[in-house]
Amino acid sequence: MKTIAVEQAVFTSTDRGPIKGYQLVAKSAGIDRRLEQELSRWSPTRGFRDRPVDWSLNCFPVFEDLTAITRTTLGGPEYSGRGGTQIVTLILVLRSDQLEAYDFNPITLAQTAMALGLLKLPLDLNCEQLAPALLPADPLIQNRCSHRDDAARSEAQILSQIAALVAEGRRAAVVGPVDPIATADRLIHSLPVESRRDFSFTTGLEPSLSRPFVVHFLSHASAAVQRTLDAQNVVCLNASA
């Protein structure tokens, strides 16, 4: 099987070294200082407040020719011993030509990576130097969107609204009881390939000025989250309506 080598990194809290707190604690050799700073900017230091979700899949472009596909999950207790839970973000970084083999669909690539044990805990977080991650040059997961079920059909209107907003260069948040992975997958398949190159989304991270995702998927939005979305001119779409 032909494979591709992609860069990988881990962002979490640590008390190792002169700087304590959240940072890239492990990375492969191709991640330089500039890329490290950008990956750190997009990676959260707070978890899934007031929500039952314990992990999130995220994707965002990095510079002109790179895309990061990340999975944020809960780790063990934080080193501070104050009772907090460690947030861990597992990161893969791909060139455009590598992602093109997956039709610029980060969901397909993430599912393939997870099937091979990547983007998952446990990792040896004491190892600062990681080898590049090896992935199939072509996806292992077939397109599951060709057969649309009743749930998918019921989301057709909201998917159409999101696609229209994306085409206008606007941002959106889907709030309500949807399957975020499946809905994001259907949305990506509905977008032209050229629109997928710079598309970004998160299936669970709360909005932040440092993480301007094009589309958020949120199970619900508290008053504080709603204010943040409004301040960033993010259009909220109610999936329960």
Residue map of PLM features:
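Extended, helix-rich scaffolding/adaptor regions
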Residues: 1-143, 179, 195-201, 205-209, ...
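Extended, charged alpha-helical interaction scaffolds
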Residues: 132-163
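Conserved, folded interaction/cargo-binding domains in eukaryotic regulatory proteins
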Residues: 153-238
